[in-house]
């Protein structure tokens, strides 16, 4: 069964807009798990524009499901992850000026770099995932880095699905199939929503985990956080039947 990890960056963005501690990220993480969320995802950036590095240490004791930290493996990020020891780290090639993640790794071009980083995390007992575009040509190199998983960057699927182009799922299916054949588990995330999650997982039932933040928090404004999480879980369950 595909697991739902809730990305709480958007909650941190709301908090930071006023400079205080409302909404409280720790309380939000506790509630998300009580409501059925099967993991908590955060994506700290060096400028701390949403998740602050201190948030990682505050959240670690209360995440009783799975803690997934995403980010570009610069020195400060690596130190943060090694000190906090989440269940999973997802490596993302963030551009400094990017509003949000907008591309996966070129695992061929950055093979040596990724291999060294992944070795460090795996020696610390941390499961490692590589953020990847839906490109089968990048899968073999991803597997050879020593990574445990890939996370499919699903923005293009979400955009095309919204336009009615269901064939946009095909490169994701091909990439996921090849990843599994190469011994990698497959996660997915970015712009997945209540509108498209069921179709995506039905077409790729091997997905181990989805990480959803922006859409889920936005939908929760209308439906409530508990109702929204439960709605995702129902759609995932139906898709996995």
PLM features per residue range, with description:
Residues 1-86, 167:
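Conserved N-terminal beta1-alpha1 strand-loop-helix module at the mouth
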Residues 2-8, 40-42, 67-69, 89-91, ...:
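Hydrophobic faces of well-ordered beta-strands that scaffold small-molecule active sites
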Residues 49-75, 109-129, 165-188, 194, ...:
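Alpha-helix-loop-beta-strand connector modules within alpha/beta enzyme cores
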Residues 127-179:
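Histidine/lysine/aspartate-rich catalytic loop segments that bind and position anionic ligands
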């Amino acid at each position: 069964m595909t697991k739902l990890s809730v990305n709480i960056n958007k909650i941190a963005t709301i908090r930071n807009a006023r400079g205080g501690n409302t909404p409280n990220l720790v309380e939000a993480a506790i509630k998300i798990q009580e409501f059925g969320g099967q993991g908590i995802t955060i994506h700290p950036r060096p400028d701390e524009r949403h998740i602050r590095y201190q948030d990682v240490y505050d959240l670690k004791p209360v995440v009783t499901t799975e803690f997934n930290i995403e980010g570009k493996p610069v020195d400060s990020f690596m130190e943060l992850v090694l000190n906090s020891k989440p269940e999973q780290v997802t490596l993302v090639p963030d551009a400094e000026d990017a509003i949000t993640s907008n591309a996966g790794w070129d695992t061929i071009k950055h093979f040596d770099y990724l291999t060294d980083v992944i070795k460090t995390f795996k020696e610390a007992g941390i499961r490692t995932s590589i953020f990847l575009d839906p490109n089968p040509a990048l899968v073999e190199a991803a597997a050879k880095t020593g990574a445990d998983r890939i996370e499919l960057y699903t923005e293009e699927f979400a955009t095309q699905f919204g336009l009615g182009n269901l064939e946009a799922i095909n490169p994701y299916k091909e990439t996921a199939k090849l990843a599994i054949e190469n011994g990698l588990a497959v996660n997915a995330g970015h712009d997945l929503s209540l509108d498209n999650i069921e179709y995506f997982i039905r077409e790729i039932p091997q997905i181990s985990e989805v990480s959803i933040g922006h859409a889920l928090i936005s939908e929760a404004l209308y439906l409530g956080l508990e109702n929204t999480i439960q709605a995702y879980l129902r759609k995932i369950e139906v898709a996995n039947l």
